[in-house]
């Protein structure tokens, strides 16, 4: 068990950057060359997990070690929701962050991992503020939207980030006497609801993930209030991964400059083939 403030401090260092999914050492090197602040090591990007079906589990430790060996930036890896043994294995490998991820098949449909029991910081997804505060209450040091990973469709990530912002503004404007009832309705820890009321933000960094496929998508999430962006299938399922990766990194840095966004969006080749979000939703996994 370690200090949550230290874990949050490590997450704060990723602000204003891009975290990229990679499935091998070569992709990890491309991501680092493009300016990624971290990589997510996994065997299959979410688009392939959707296409292949079956049970998606933690990646092979050999793959994770290979990716860690070629990059000097932080390496994240995914564990299934509730699968604390996968998390123990990942921590033993020395990964920098663990993502308790809805992209993988849940191992426990009632309980998430008790993240306070680990020294490594955890990333968790959310669709609304109540879900975010529950994960933070369990020890998460970094929150992201769930979006709909593997679709190239930004609509769910936008909906979820707007909902979190709406919920934060509601609590910020509430009377202090209403906070306990709000905590009850949101199923959120009371002390965290009080924090949001006082500070008007989450107590941990708030990133965006799920469906980011273009520089414009990344800039959109930043303008909506995300502090960094995860990109999964959108880079290495595109025609020119290195060029697109560099463009998305630039878009996150200059998200408020339409001229630069236009420049970096030019001649990127075909993006990943997107799909609609009217099928099984990964974002409905977990609670």
From Swiss-Prot:
Gene3D superfamilies: Aldolase class I (3.20.20.70). It is an enzyme of class 4 (lyase). Pfam families: SOR_SNZ (PF01680). D-ribose 5-phosphate binds at residues 21, 150, 211, 232-233. PROSITE patterns: PDXS_SNZ_1 (PS01235), PDXS_SNZ_2 (PS51129). GO terms for molecular function: pyridoxal 5'-phosphate synthase (glutamine hydrolysing) activity. GO terms for biological process: amino acid metabolic process; pyridoxal phosphate biosynthetic process; pyridoxine biosynthetic process. It catalyses: aldehydo-D-ribose 5-phosphate + D-glyceraldehyde 3-phosphate + L-glutamine = pyridoxal 5'-phosphate + L-glutamate + phosphate + 3 H2O + H(+). Its EC number is 4.3.3.6. SUPFAM superfamilies: Ribulose-phoshate binding barrel. InterPro entries: Aldolase_TIM (IPR013785), PdxS/SNZ (IPR001852), PdxS/SNZ_N (IPR033755), RibuloseP-bd_barrel (IPR011060). D-glyceraldehyde 3-phosphate binds at residue 162. The keyword Lyase applies. It comes from the Bacteria. Keywords: Lyase, Pyridoxal phosphate, Schiff base. Pathway: Cofactor biosynthesis; pyridoxal 5'-phosphate biosynthesis. The active site is at 78 (schiff-base intermediate with d-ribose 5-phosphate). Catalyzes the formation of pyridoxal 5'-phosphate from ribose 5-phosphate (RBP), glyceraldehyde 3-phosphate (G3P) and ammonia. The ammonia is provided by the PdxT subunit. Can also use ribulose 5-phosphate and dihydroxyacetone phosphate as substrates, resulting from enzyme-catalyzed isomerization of RBP and G3P, respectively. In the presence of PdxT, forms a dodecamer of heterodimers. HAMAP family: PdxS. Belongs to the PdxS/SNZ family. This is Pyridoxal 5'-phosphate synthase subunit PdxS. It comes from Francisella philomiragia subsp. philomiragia (strain ATCC 25017 / CCUG 19701 / FSC 153 / O#319-036).
């Amino acid at each position: 068990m370690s200090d949550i403030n230290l874990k949050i401090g490590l997450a704060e260092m990723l602000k204003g950057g891009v975290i990229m999914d990679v499935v091998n050492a070569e992709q990890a090197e491309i991501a680092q060359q493009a300016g990624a602040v971290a990589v997510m090591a996994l065997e299959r990007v979410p688009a392939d997990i959707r296409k292949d079906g079956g049970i998606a589990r933690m990646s092979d430790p050999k793959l994770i070690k290979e990716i860690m060996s070629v990059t000097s930036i932080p390496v994240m890896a995914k564990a299934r929701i509730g699968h604390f043994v996968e998390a123990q294995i990942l921590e033993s490998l020395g990964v920098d962050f663990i993502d308790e991820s809805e992209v993988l098949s849940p191992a426990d449909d009632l309980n998430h991992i008790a993240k306070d029991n680990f020294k490594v910081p955890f990333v968790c997804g959310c669709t609304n503020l109540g879900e975010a505060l529950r994960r933070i209450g369990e020890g998460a040091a970094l929150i992201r939207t769930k979006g709909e990973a593997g679709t190239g469709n930004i609509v769910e990530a936008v909906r979820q980030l707007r909902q979190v912002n709406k919920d934060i503004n509601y609590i910020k404007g509430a009377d202090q006497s209403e906070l306990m009832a709000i905590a009850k309705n949101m199923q959120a820890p009371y002390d965290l609801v009080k924090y949001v009321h006082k500070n008007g933000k989450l107590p941990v960094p708030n990133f965006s993930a799920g469906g980011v496929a273009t520089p414009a998508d990344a800039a959109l999430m930043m303008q909506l209030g995300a502090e960094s962006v995860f990109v999964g299938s959108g880079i290495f399922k595109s025609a020119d991964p290195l060029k697109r990766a560099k463009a998305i990194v630039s878009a996150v840095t200059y998200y408020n400059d339409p001229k630069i966004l236009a420049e970096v969006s030019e001649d990127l080749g075909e993006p990943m083939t997107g799909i609609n979000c009217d099928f099984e939703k990964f974002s409905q996994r977990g609670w």
